[in-house]
């Protein structure tokens, strides 16, 4: 909905599932010609994709992400000096975490806004270079601090491992990684670029193994229940929109290879 602000339009409401909205004789009208279906929104819109100032189900994406950070703080008991976001995707969650814990929030990483998203780049080499180009450590903030590093999600681990090393190289005493969403263990066939299960770190490693892989002092993901609480959604909404057969999964992985 942030696009409406740019062009000076007024946001009235969201178009509902299966709804047709049209204008007739300068009057806004709506019909629902299809049988009602259970709402099954893409959770990644709330976690990552939507711009923070866009509205989803009556709240901004920013509000949801702050909620995720606060829920994660409720589930955590680590002691640290500072909460640092992975900019810009982790900003809202890190702020929610810091406010809930009563910890200092600071910008330990400075982002170059002329570099795009790294986890959706096509090759590992390009993704690794993208992290170095996109983020630079703010040494005056980081040095000699026990840091809680908050990000919105962990997909391949590309960004997290590079950032953890960057923080330690800049003098951080400890780096505790906190992810404001649950583990991503399965591919999505509706737009998220996670082609195969083998590319998803959480599909192939335990939390302890991922922590060792990214070289963090500790690692924690938001629980599924924490995600539901942060969204204000019923847990029964979490089924995939349609069944995906094992044959389809295997064919998809073969094509990706």
Model-identified regions with their sequence ranges:
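Gly/Ser/Thr-rich loops at beta-strand to alpha-helix junctions
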Residues: 87-93, 156-158
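Short acidic/polar active-site loop segments enriched in Thr and Asp
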Residues: 81, 173, 217
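Short, well-ordered alpha-helices that flank and scaffold nucleotide-derived cofactor binding pockets
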Residues: 74, 95, 99, 165, ...
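PRPP/pyrophosphate-binding module of the type I phosphoribosyltransferase fold
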Residues: 130-203, 207, 213, 256
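Active-site phosphate/pyrophosphate- and oxyanion-stabilizing loops and adjacent acidic/basic residues
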Residues: 70, 95, 208
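A conserved beta-strand->alpha-helix junction
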Residues: 105-116, 213-231
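N-terminal segments that mediate ammonia production and transfer
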Residues: 1-90, 98-139, 147, 233-238, ...
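Conserved small/polar residues in nucleotide/adenosyl-binding loops
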Residues: 247-254
């Amino acid at each position: 909905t942030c696009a409406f602000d740019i062009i000076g339009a007024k946001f009235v409401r969201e178009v509902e599932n299966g709804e047709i909205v049209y204008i007739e004789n300068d009057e806004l009208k709506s019909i629902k010609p299809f049988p009602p279906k259970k709402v099954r929104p893409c959770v990644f819109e709330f976690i990552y994709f939507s711009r923070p100032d866009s509205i989803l189900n009556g709240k901004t994406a920013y509000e949801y992400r702050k909620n995720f950070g606060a829920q994660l703080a409720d589930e955590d008991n680590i002691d640290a000096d500072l909460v640092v976001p992975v900019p810009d995707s982790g900003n809202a969650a890190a702020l929610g975490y810091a406010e809930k814990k009563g910890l200092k929030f600071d910008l330990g990483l400075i982002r170059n806004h002329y570099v795009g998203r790294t986890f959706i780049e096509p090759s590992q080499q390009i993704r690794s270079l993208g992290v170095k180009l996109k983020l630079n450590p703010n040494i005056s903030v980081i040095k000699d601090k026990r840091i809680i590093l908050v990000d919105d999600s962990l997909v391949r681990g590309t960004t997290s491992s590079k950032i953890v090393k960057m923080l330690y190289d800049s003098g951080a005493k400890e780096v505790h990684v906190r992810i404001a969403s649950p583990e991503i263990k399965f591919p999505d066939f509706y737009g998220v670029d996670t082609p195969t299960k083998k590319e998803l770190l959480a599909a192939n490693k335990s939390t302890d193994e991922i922590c060792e892989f990214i070289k963090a002092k500790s690692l924690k993901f938001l629980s599924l229940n924490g995600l539901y609480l942060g969204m204000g959604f019923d847990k029964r909404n979490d089924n995939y929109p349609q069944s995906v057969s094992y044959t389809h999964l295997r064919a998809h992985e073969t094509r990706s290879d």
